């Protein structure tokens, strides 16, 4: 997955052609239809849905953190149906091997004799749900993460290009649960967002029980196609963003790094490792997608603030002192938003 590179001045405005304008209008109108379709099977989780859509339209990948039984699989599968994308679910287990993900070569008899034939694994799809990715050892985790980065896999020295669009949503159980293999920081950094999926409020949970015990869920109707998603990738990158907002994203990211010049005192006290440059890139790119989804052709500081938590929470590593004092990543992100001055303030 190539990283976005923001130009130093004003980007090309969005909707520069009639075709672009029509695509933007379809995207804006389609968001309401997406919510309507998902409401047939999913109750609540609006913030989770918004963040997944932003990542999908930005060309990024998502890590979803939450306890089992929160309808993560149903949500991802439903989104794949809405966009008419080929969907595959990979259940990560301690004995899962890299070839179980990428595919393997087998010896097959043909009219010309025996030949090695590559049998594609489940990674050859448009939308992958990597379920409980932290249940499998690092070697197998790396097989999927390599495919995420390169959009290709290699078997017996032969490269096999993955289908586009290629979007991975990996779920993980909270790291304090038994039998987990935490993802290394360098691999976590490949995910655009870490989306927190929490238990529903009582009223929404009551609605889930009523809905799932009274009737069969409605059928999800496709709204967009894979070609539409690729077009939206281009449109998102055309959304203009002011340089002072880019600087705000960069300063917010840099402030998370301990022992740096502009690091607040609480970062030096509580953080072992801060966010890298990729965080700033994803903040700006995600802000562009959020603006476009809301019908705006410009980015605001609120877009960046709203996405700070999903972008930063898996890129900041707290130290033992923070744990002893009961401080977590969410607390640090909130403090960063208070400490870093917004543009024009």
Regions found by a protein language model. Name each.
Residues 66, 131-132, 143:
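Walker B catalytic acidic pair
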Residues 210-299:
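AAA+ P-loop NTPase domains with strong preference for DNA replication initiators
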Residues 51-54, 107-129:
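Conserved alpha-helical scaffold flanking the Walker A/P-loop in AAA+ ATPase domains
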Residues 23-70:
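Pre-Walker A (pre-P-loop) alpha-helix and adjacent loop at the N terminus of AAA/AAA+ ATPase modules
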Residues 56-94, 107:
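Walker A/P-loop
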Residues 67, 101, 171:
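P-loop (Walker A) phosphate-binding loop of NTP-binding proteins
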């Amino acid at each position: 997955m190539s990283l976005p590179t923001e130009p130093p001045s004003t980007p090309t405005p969005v909707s520069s052609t009639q075709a672009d304008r029509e695509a933007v209008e379809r995207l804006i109108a389609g968001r309401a239809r997406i919510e309507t379709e998902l409401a047939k099977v999913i109750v609540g989780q609006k913030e989770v849905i918004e963040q997944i859509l932003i990542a999908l339209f930005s060309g990024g990948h998502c890590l979803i953190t939450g306890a089992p039984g929160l309808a993560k699989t149903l949500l991802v599968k439903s989104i794949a149906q809405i966009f008419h994308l080929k969907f595959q679910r990979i259940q990560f287990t301690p004995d899962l091997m890299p070839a179980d993900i990428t595919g393997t070569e087998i010896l097959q008899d043909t009219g010309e004799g025996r030949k090695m034939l590559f049998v594609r694994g489940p990674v050859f799809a448009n939308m992958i749900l990597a379920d409980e990715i932290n249940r499998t050892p690092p070697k197998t985790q790396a097989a999927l993460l390599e495919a995420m980065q390169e959009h290709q896999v290699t078997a017996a020295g032969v490269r096999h290009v993955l289908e586009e669009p290629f979007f991975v949503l990996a779920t993980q159980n909270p790291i304090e649960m038994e039998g987990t293999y935490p993802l290394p920081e360098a691999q976590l950094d490949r995910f655009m967002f870490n989306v927190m999926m929490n238990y529903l409020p009582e009223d929404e949970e009551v609605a889930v029980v009523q809905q799932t015990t009274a009737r069969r869920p409605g059928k999800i109707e496709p709204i967009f196609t894979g070609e539409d998603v690729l077009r939206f990738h281009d449109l998102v990158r055309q959304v203009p963003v002011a340089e002072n907002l880019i600087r705000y994203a960069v300063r917010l990211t840099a402030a998370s790094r301990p022992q740096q010049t502009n690091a607040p005192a609480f970062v030096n006290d509580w953080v072992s490792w801060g966010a890298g440059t990729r965080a700033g890139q994803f903040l700006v790119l995600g802000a562009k997608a959020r603006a476009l989804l809301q019908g705006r052709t410009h980015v605001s500081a609120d877009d960046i603030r709203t996405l700070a938590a999903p972008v930063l929470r898996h890129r900041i590593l707290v130290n033992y002192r923070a744990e002893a004092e009961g401080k977590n990543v969410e607390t640090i992100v909130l403090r960063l938003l208070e400490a870093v001055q917004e543009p024009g303030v």
